[in-house]
């Protein structure tokens, strides 16, 4: 009986470990503020190194767009869109640049109700502000 309970606990733990999201967060940051609710997400930081992702779900009629506001004082940040474990580069934000634009997504994302936005730094980034809305 003890062995059966032990095996059951191991199976449940294995299932929990394997049930993680498709993308992994791995980062070091100071003064990191993130928010992700439904079709909107944001991230602000003083310093950031690594990778962070947001899961966005589209509500209502699809417009096939992603609204993006981004700024970075120093460093370089790659912004990807992810679906099904794959990712595609949307744009690269470099130190001193800022963006306020609406990106029309490729047709392959037309039927996707859920996407991931993945932010990956190239080295250390300083004073970043990123906001997204999936339409």
Regions found by a protein language model. Name each.
Residues 55, 100-107:
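Exposed aromatic-hydrophobic patches
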Residues 121-135:
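Edge beta-strands of jelly-roll/beta-sandwich modules across compartments, strongly enriched
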